[in-house]
Amino acid sequence: MKIKLLSAILLLAFVAITSSCRRDTVVADNLSYMPFESQCLGTSLDGNVRIKAWGSGATRGDAIENAKRNALRDVIFNGVKLGNPACQRPLTYEVNAHERHEMYFNRFFADGGEYTQYATLEDETLTSRTKAKGDVQQNYGVVVTVKRANLQQKLINDGIINPYNY
């Protein structure tokens, strides 16, 4: 009886441990060379927005960092057109703002730059992650939280956007 009880407990522990392991959702190889658009998943009352963003790179880490950068670029310059309509309005309406303030944004989006303060990955155990892997590069779709209100205030303080446009 003790052996059956012990084996049942071990079996349940094994099932619980293996079911919590999450794998990437893998799509076709040829999709790793296709551009994907960001999608707004929702907003929160503290000024944060949740975005499903895509990034490509030679490694998984590079692709995920590029996904964070792409999410921020969409929020700043284009707005996020897919998904929740609350994210459609960009932070700047200035034409060619990226080119006009190129030095500023090159520093902002540099490896380990200030962008890391405004874009964070959600807990990966709770969110889905999509992977498209080709021979040379990988595309990852991850859920990124963008601190939109904080980012807007920083861009106003740095003179990049006009505070009277809001």
What are the functions of these language-model segments?
Residues 1-8:
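Bacterial N-terminal signal peptides that target proteins for export
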Residues 8-16:
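Bacterial N-terminal signal peptides
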